[in-house]
């Protein structure tokens, strides 16, 4: 199964959007480092932040998983980013090129739990 985790960039209040814009370089660097360190596991960086409108941004990773234990590292990464930068995250699967969200977690949604996310994904 191909999953994705994205930083929630839509429906942000002005204050949240400003903070996201300020932290964008650090977030991109952290995700780039994770993708490069896990390239052997086919982790791919999703970095579509060219638009002037935050709501159109897509920033995160995708990676194949076959067991719930494969979710530990990416969920830990995004939980850490959520805590450090005050963001929320979206997790889901990719099927036929389309992203299907299954859960949200982070600063406002609460910490992401690997077991629950695995259940939502059907792992």
Put a short name on every predicted segment.
Residues 7-9, 36-38, 83, 119:
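Intrinsic disorder/low-complexity segments
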Residues 17-21, 34, 41, 73, ...:
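General "foldedness" signal
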Residues 25-35, 79-88:
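A common structural junction motif
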Residues 32-50:
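Short, glycine- and small/hydrophobic-rich beta-strand elements in well-ordered beta-sheets
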Residues 48-123:
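Charged interaction segments
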């Amino acid at each position: 199964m191909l999953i994705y985790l994205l930083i929630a960039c839509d429906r942000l209040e002005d204050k949240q959007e400003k903070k996201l814009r300020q932290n964008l370089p650090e977030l991109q660097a952290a995700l780039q480092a994770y993708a490069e360190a896990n390239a052997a596991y086919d982790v791919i960086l999703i970095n579509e932040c060219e638009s002037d409108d935050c709501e159109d941004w897509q920033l995160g990773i995708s990676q194949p998983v076959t067991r719930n234990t494969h979710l530990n590292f990416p969920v830990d990464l995004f939980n850490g980013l959520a805590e450090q930068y005050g963001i929320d995250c979206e997790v889901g699967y990719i099927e036929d090129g389309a992203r299907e969200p299954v859960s949200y977690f982070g600063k406002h949604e609460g910490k992401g739990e690997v077991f629950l996310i695995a259940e939502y994904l059907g792992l």
